[in-house]
Every structure is written in structure tokens, then in C-alpha cells.
Regions:
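N-terminal small/glycine-rich loop or linker at the start of catalytic domains
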Residues: 1-22, 86-94, 125-132
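Active-site beta->alpha loop and helix N-cap motifs at the rims of alpha/beta catalytic domains
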Residues: 61-139
Length: 214
């Protein structure tokens, strides 16, 4: 029987303690959740960090550093996966659609991979996706993705290529062909997310058929 890889996202990008009080917030809580997951059998722990004031997703380097150090210092054999997703939330201003509203969180591609270059996790997420969400656009332009992928490759960190729909696989294949993502690629299907591909067997078979050969 083939081995099964269990990956545990201990917070995700959206849930907050308002929705579920069990969602970890502090670096110690996040690290302890990751360590518990590893001891329960997870091979990969996927980590976001949270602002200690707002409890919402944060990009603060020192929060990532504390989480990474706590996990690395623990007696667990687990692959550390840090997100690069934050910094791509765009919602147009109602007064001027060409500008971002207060609900947006946009930043440079360099900022989005700052913690990856500094901390060098085993792997990191790379969302090759632009798509509508409930209240905003998840905006990852080809230019920004190329810059991020190049930094990640030069840091010798393996990107976990997150695809939410079929076209995202084509985008990733172009980046592989251009030498921005090293082979063999590591893909992750993100299915059932508003408004991406549905979580069905048919979807998985179609997306699997589109993978690069080998």
C-alpha cells in the first residue's frame, strides 16, 4: 500500500477564535498545535501566524521566527511549511475601484517571502492562483509569482504549489518550463474553496491528468 502524507494546517488563513476558540493565536499556541499534530502522525505542518492584537493573519517576521524555532527545538520529526499567502488580498475601493479598500492587504512579492529567505523552512506554500473569494480577490499576478518563485528557488526551499482550479496548473507548468520552479514539482490540490474547483473525484482526476509528465 502506498504511503499517505498527512499535512496539518494548524490555523489556516481564515479561521479566527471568534469562529472557534480552539484556533491558536500566539506563537507558542501555534507551535504547540504543530508539535501535537506531528506527534499524532502529521508529516507536514503548515503554519500561518496571527497578530497578537487583532488575532488576524500577520506577516511579522519575528512571529514566524518564534514559531519556527519552537517547532525545530521540539523532539519531533516533521516537515515545516510556512505560508506565503498573506499580502494578496485585494478589494476595490467603492469611491475609486483602481485603488484598494481598507479590507485589502497587498504588499510586494519581496515582503511575502521575507520570512522564507530568513528562516529557510523545509517547504513553503506558493499559491499560483488569482480568484474571487467571498469579499475580495485573491490576487497573485504572474510578475509577482515569478519574483517569489525565483527567491524561493535561490533559497533552496521547496515550494508547495497550491492550485485551486485547472488554469492554475497551466500557470505552474509555465513557471516550471521557465526554470522558476525546480523539478520534480510538489503540487497541493485546494478543492472546495469559494470559488475554486469543487471537491469531487472528477475534479481530482482532471487536474491529475494535467500534471507535468513524471
Amino acid at each position: 500500500m502506498p504511503s499517505t502524507i498527512i499535512s496539518c494546517a494548524v490555523t489556516g488563513s481564515a479561521p479566527t477564535p471568534d469562529k472557534n476558540p480552539a484556533v491558536p493565536v500566539t506563537p507558542l499556541e501555534i507551535a504547540n498545535s504543530a508539535i501535537d499534530a506531528a506527534r499524532a502522525g502529521a508529516a507536514i505542518v503548515h503554519c500561518h501566524v496571527r497578530s497578537l492584537e487583532t488575532k488576524k493573519p500577520s506577516m511579522e517576521l519575528e512571529l514566524y521566527r518564534e514559531v519556527a524555532n519552537l517547532i525545530r527545538d521540539a523532539d519531533v520529526d516533521v516537515i515545516l511549511n510556512l505560508t506565503t499567502g498573506p499580502g494578496a488580498r485585494f478589494s476595490p475601493s467603492s469611491a475609486d475601484p483602481g485603488k484598494a479598500s481598507a479590507n485589502s492587504q497587498m504588499c510586494s512579492p519581496e515582503k511575502r517571502v521575507e520570512h522564507i529567505l530568513e528562516l529557510k523552512p523545509d517547504i513553503c506554500s506558493l499559491d499560483v492562483a488569482t480568484m474571487n473569494r467571498k469579499s475580495h480577490v485573491f490576487l497573485n499576478s504572474p510578475e509577482h509569482l515569478n519574483v517569489m518563485a525565483d527567491y524561493i528557488r535561490k533559497a533552496n526551499v521547496k515550494p508547495e504549489i497550491e492550485v485551486f482550479d485547472t488554469g492554475h496548473i497551466l500557470n505552474a507548468k509555465k513557471m516550471i518550463d521557465d526554470g522558476l520552479i525546480a523539478e520534480p514539482p510538489f503540487f497541493l490540490f485546494c478543492l472546495g474553496v469559494d470559488y475554486g474547483a469543487p471537491a469531487t473525484l472528477e475534479t481530482m482526476l482532471l487536474m491529475r491528468s494535467m500534471f507535468p509528465k513524471g
